[in-house]
């Protein structure tokens, strides 16, 4: 039985030649189909307002992923909320922190990033203990947060 097609569960890359599957498919004479199998849908503005959370009451946002950044700024745009320049951000990793450049001007004193673990996030929270935090998470999140 010879394999002639491979399904990759990712969106098609913009430059196909830079894909790791390009060289493999050329070498083995295979067809590669790209199809994103996972679709992330953000919470609606109505659902967010039902939680009675005021974004502007918080001084620091904690982001765990790029999708939470997209959802946060989408909700702010839909609710016509202007995020103040004084807002600080704590991100899981440096890659997530750099993704914030899509929405804000990147300044090191406003953006902090952890090493990807819960303990490194706690260190950043303790460092900024006078701030009021808002944690943005995706719904099925890995529960490394302690119950409070």
Residue positions per predicted region:
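Conserved beta-alpha
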Residues: 1-148
